[in-house]
Amino acid sequence: MLLGACDTFRAAANEQIKHWAERLNVDIVSSQHGADSAAVAFDALEAAKSRGRDIVILDTAGRLHTKRNLMKELEKLHRVIKKQDDSAPHHSWLVVDGSLGSNSIEQARVFHKSFPL
């Protein structure tokens, strides 16, 4: 398994996921704060191939479905993944805040358009 730290927006995101990767003894690919998350995903997929890893988990930044620029970033991430493996992604998870109530359904619909769930 290999982790791709694609949350390049939140200040402590890299440190947090690196901590868990170390605790779990899992390889990780990360970049600098503010880097292109799709580039990190590409690097993670390439690293997984070269290291013989068959599972890659890409952790992306949280985002609101109403922020079009962030949804476009997610679409770019999806295109990069598909170029690496036409059948990917094999699984996609959307984690939502439980307090959103019925708004989470609309959020899932919008996310599904940008990155199939």
Residue positions per predicted region:
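P-loop/Walker A NTP-binding module and the surrounding RecA-like catalytic core of P-loop NTPases
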Residues: 1-117
